[in-house]
Amino acid sequence: MEGNGERDTMMVEPPDSQEFAELWLRNLIVRDNSLWGKEEEIPDDLQEVPCDVLLSDMLQPQSSSSPPTSTVPVTSDYPGLLNFTLHFQESSGTKSVTCTYSPDLNKLFCQLAKTCPVLMAVSSSPPPGSVLRATAVYKRSEHVAEVVRRCPHHERSNDSSDGPAPPGHLLRVEGNSRAVYQEDGNTQAHSVVVPYEPPQVGSQSTTVLYNYMCNSSCMGGMNRRPILTIITLETQDGHLLGRRTFEVRVCACPGRDRKTEESNFKKQQEPKTSGKTLTKRSMKDPPSHPEASKKSKNSSSDDEIYTLQVRGKERYEFLKKINDGLELSDVVPPADQEKYRQKLLSKTCRKERDGAAGEPKRGKKRLVKEEKCDSD
């Protein structure tokens, strides 16, 4: 019987690999739990984290919460590794245009609630699930912490085009049912998010249609304060892939305002550049010959030809003689001019001497044949 018992114990099947691993891990956990009582009792060689704990941490799902946003938004451009860029459709400079973009000012001029197409391009495809976020912020530093929202008048107006957008949001997306309107929990800034869609066949950019639902001059809203629109390309977890910024003005006549601001911008740039060059020249090498410098400054105006209208032929002949004399003085060298002056002076002096010699010395009038004396 004893032999049979020994045989039975010998015939017990060994546990498979899965059961063996569970027993081994259970043994390790028991040992580790016995050592977690006091930290000073743990030997130095067991201070490291056990492998099963590391494996369990690695197998747990990571949280997909987006990183917290800062109070002051970043408005600088960041193309990123994907070379994220923005483009705008070319528009005519007429006053009747509803949306126009100025490359010199990096500014978009548009009317209230009108379609503003923005073209976005990347050099390579972003990760799946990427989104495009558009946020409006104030441009000046004293207003940057405030939330850009619609004025009370437009916010209370019942508009059928609002759709799912909250009434206080300035930025809207047109023609995209997947647009999501969000409010940041830290800064309360309003933003609208749409999924990134790859360009269609034959196109290199993705187009998003935006609407601005309040004028820049509305009291209680923007109140003539300039705003910026920040468009970011983000992953599904909220990590930044690229950022672009442009200024926006919502007005009644975008074409007129663009032309006015561009002309003012060019006028401001001209005196700055000319002033800089003049100061640099004066500081480096002051002119040794002021007369020569004056001539060089006026050389451009001296070469121009002007037309003067004169009434009356006598005046015309008189002014023509003056002009001819000035033209001759420009052609004749200064040394020859001095010779001609000496000749003219000698002629005038000779005439005066001849006239003085012909007259009587004592002041009596010389008689002519036809004239008679008073006594006669």
Swiss-Prot record:
Region ranges (Transcription activation (acidic)): 1-36
Motif (Bipartite nuclear localization signal) on chain: 280-297
Protein name as annotated: Cellular tumor antigen p53
Residue stretches of biased makeup (Basic and acidic residues): 150-159, 257-270, 282-294, 349-361
Residues covered by region (Disordered): 150-171, 257-306, 342-376
UniProt binding sites for Zn(2+): C151, H154, C214, C218
Residue window of motif Nuclear export signal: 317-328
Subcellular location: Cytoplasm; Nucleus
Cofactors: Zn(2+)
DNA-binding segment(s): 77-268
Annotated region described as Interaction with DNA, given as residue ranges: 249-256
